Amino acid sequence: MVATRARRRKRASVTQLYSTCKAAGTCPPDVVNKVEGTTLADKILQWSGLGIFLGGLGIGTGSGSGGRTGYIPLGGGGRPGVVDIAPARPPIIIDLWHHTEPSIVNLVEDSSIIQSGSPIPTFTGTDGFEITSSSTTTPAVLDITPSAGTVHVSSTNIENPLYIEPPSIEAPQSGEVSDIYLLVHYSGTHGYEEIPMEVFASNVSTGTEPISSTPTPGVSRIAAPRLYSKSYTQVKVTNPDFISKPSTFVTFNNPAFEPIDTSITFEEPDAVAPDPDFLDIITLHRPALTSRRGTVRFSRLGQKATMRTRSGKQIGARVHYYHDISRIAPADELEMQPLLSPSNNYSYDIYADLDEAETGFIQPTHTTPMSHSSLSRQLPSLSSSMSSSYANVTIPFSTTYSVPIHTGPDVVLPTSPTVWPYVPHTSIDTKHSIVILGGDYYLWPYTHLLRKRRKRIPYFFTDGIVAH
């Protein structure tokens, strides 16, 4: 992502600054001197113009009119433009009046040309108007009977035995339209075929049935925030108000309503925060409940704005604030109750014979003879009466053995002779054979001078490879 740099604003010109700050009297000296023409260069020209006549060159601090001759335009030349002139109209000649003719127009003296208009009608009689009425007793009858004709009605019924919709079977209906009667009857025997259906899904409730007609095909899980990464500063908050009033740790304002499960944004954080750990915080994200080392932890992520660039970019660290609510108690252990009473110290043998179990208590004794000792084992007995019921029970399957130890005769083990066998010792230059008479013997001294070789033992693998 390429960072966009903020566009620099153009500074105001000298004339704009002079027009705004002159009335208030806060103009800098260089602005006033440049606009009013009192700079050092202007003063040098004024002093030099007292003794030097520059004529009409227009050099100096005058009004800028170009002197007496004015400015001479640069460039010039070229053909002059052609001016279009319209043709002249001929003059209108007006006849002159003679001085002997009067200039007064006489009025029309003959009034016979005036017409008075149409004459006014005259009415005779004083009885007024006569009103006559007429009544008719015969009603108006409109003949709307159609002309006589023959109407032929034909119908076609096609039955499909593979598909018959039950709601389409309705009761017979009749209709009357201008002396034409239509009566439709539906009757007949409809056969059907029974097809064995298989149940693909049972009605056993597993607790995971969808609650909508189009359930979501997959379960979308939100990745848990990595609160303990190296990019976050871990800060522990011991004040329990951090759960219900987190904004009081950043600003001194007391809002009327503060949501708990939403993110909080601070437009202008205070220069001095109520809690030093929350200095320069501009955003506190929504909380999260996690379990950490056997505790229930309330966490919020915070964003600081320690630095601000000219482009408006805010730079700051990310902090993880957490508060331990309580510890998670260990799971309750259920106390198991014995199936049998403590008085009857019997064990149940799962391999006991059913015929022997019906006789009551069986106490067989099996003795195995051994040399110099005897071991006897007593098999456990079985109680056939167990009618008590318990909520939490245990079934002991272990058996106990009674092993009596008896003393036997002493066993004498063979011992080695206490005197070492005699081996004749001769000089080295004489060759003699070595006679072994006992468990210990001397090797021929010449064998010590021979080179010792490593004994190679071959190893055979299952694939037939021999390794040395």
UniProtKB/Swiss-Prot annotation:
Disulfide bond in keyword set: yes
Quaternary structure, from the entry: Interacts with major capsid protein L1. Interacts with E2; this interaction inhibits E2 transcriptional activity but not the DNA replication function E2. Interacts with host GADD45GIP1. Interacts with host HSPA8; this interaction is required for L2 nuclear translocation. Interacts with host importins KPNB2 and KPNB3. Forms a complex with importin alpha2-beta1 heterodimers via interaction with the importin alpha2 adapter. Interacts with host DYNLT1; this interaction is essential for virus intracellular transport during entry.
Record's subcellular location: Virion; Host nucleus; Host early endosome; Host Golgi apparatus
Entry similarity comment: Belongs to the papillomaviridae L2 protein family.
Native source species: Human papillomavirus 51
HAMAP family: PPV_L2 (MF_04003)
Gene Ontology molecular function: DNA binding; structural molecule activity
Lineage: Viruses, Monodnaviria, Shotokuvirae, Cossaviricota, Papovaviricetes
GO annotations of cellular component type: host cell; host cell endosome; host cell Golgi apparatus; host cell nucleus; viral capsid
Protein name: Minor capsid protein L2
Motif residue range(s): Nuclear localization signal: 1-12, 449-457
